[in-house]
Amino acid sequence: MKCAVAINKIHASKEENFLIIRSLIKEAADNGAGLVLFPEAALTGLINTDLPENDLALGENVSGKYINELVSLSKKLGIWIATGFFEIEDRALYDSAVLISPDGNIALKHRRTDSGWHSPRAPKEVYKEGTEHLVIETPFGRVAFLVCGELFHDDALDAVKKLRPDLVLVPMARSAYEVEDVQDWWDTDEKWFYLERLAQLRANCLIANCLGDGAIEDSFGGAMAVDKKGRIVAEFPLYNQGLLYVEMDLENNT
């Protein structure tokens, strides 16, 4: 199956971010991808401040404008779309991800289960976490999510591993403060820590990291496709907007 991992550069306007996302989805579909994955909080960037008066406006309901537009686009183009976003429900905010199917449905929704996306000072009645991990059967196998820091929590990793997914989608928003050469640090050090964790899943994995503009968002971008043995199949350089394409055999190891 041909998959795409899309990295959209974050801007201050949610509408501008969506237009970039829409353009990348169309490009992926035009190039024959059956699935496209976007990063964590792709509509806004991970720019929450722990202040509800600022952050609730970042949220999107699963039946709201932008998610509905993604559902329509998935159906029109015949492509599965996965993305992270801030979800709002009953004035509570979640760090969520959805997988949208071409038949016009949200096939899978996941709420990040660890609290690493906000500080301990954030009001608990507003900033909330999910409580479970689910897997969905698709024409290309069993699919599950891990959102960013969940990858480094053993309980989350073990929960997903027990689901025996064929494909794990990993939207992220990772930054690196006070690192002079982030690409070198990633290539020689940090990336291998990620691969060790991914290998424990024994599943094919697609990883999409948010790309900030350096002003409102500092994430450094980048994307990877990793096989069931934790080997890199394809990768996309940091600090670049665009699409990584990869042919993945979800029944075997590559």
Predicted feature residues:
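Short beta-strand segments enriched in small/hydrophobic residues
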Residues: 1-9
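Active-site beta-strand/loop signature of hydrolases that rely on acidic residues for catalysis
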Residues: 3, 17, 25-54, 74, ...
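Hydrophobic residues at beta-strand termini and immediately following loops
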Residues: 6, 110, 136, 208, ...
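Residue-level signal for short, function-critical loop segments
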Residues: 9, 87, 149, 211
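Short, small/polar residue-rich loop motifs at catalytic or cofactor-binding pockets
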Residues: 30, 92-94, 218-220
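CN hydrolase (nitrilase-like) catalytic-core segments centered on the catalytic cysteine
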Residues: 59-81, 152-241
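Short beta-strand scaffold segments in enzyme catalytic cores
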Residues: 83-85, 96-99, 134, 223-225, ...
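Active-site catalytic loop in hydrolytic enzyme cores
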Residues: 88-167, 177-192, 249-254
